[in-house]
């Protein structure tokens, strides 16, 4: 049984990862800002293997102390950074507050959370558990779609961080990977981008969250994979 911390666990991809992985017998500790939706997610998780799932109400931009408390109470071995903020305006029309929110949520919080996890794992170096950091990136990190420049920058940074961090900690038995999904059918996707996506994707449709979770599960289970950015794009 893995013990997994999942940010962005109240909706979308983070929620679906928690649901499917709980069905596989893993214990999930979900983090998000919306208490109602977190409780809804928690109630939907399987406990067939006796898992003790938890929720933590926290904003990854500012509540690192709340996240640290999870590591202090549970021997977390997997961290999934699924929290994210999208952008749907040109850079010149994006406020400084929005820019800070996008960069902090999508990139800076992932860096801080990864550092926190690694330091905790260093303190417990005798553990034989496989340890994994899994970041949720985006095809938009390299696909030039007007109106997503700040978001794209945050995800490009996240992918570079993933690759270099993987090289830094591989010898310590810690794996770091990311998935790079194309357009996924989640509440996060605006109607404007949804319409563009359905025309642009060669396969002709949006990805389901379950298809993206399948890729996450591969990176979870394959212990020889690290420093990998796995694209799931429908040919985009």
UniProtKB/Swiss-Prot annotation:
A GO MF term: quinone binding
Residues of the active site: 137, 151, 155
Family, similarity comment: Belongs to the short-chain dehydrogenases/reductases (SDR) family.
Entry's EC annotation: 1.1.1.100
Compartments where found: Mitochondrion
PANTHER family the UniProt entry points to: 3-OXOACYL-[ACYL-CARRIER-PROTEIN] REDUCTASE, SHORT-CHAIN DEHYDROGENASES/REDUCTASES FAMILY MEMBER
Chain's role: Involved in biosynthesis of fatty acids in mitochondria.
Protein name: 3-oxoacyl-[acyl-carrier-protein] reductase
Source taxon at top rank: Eukaryota
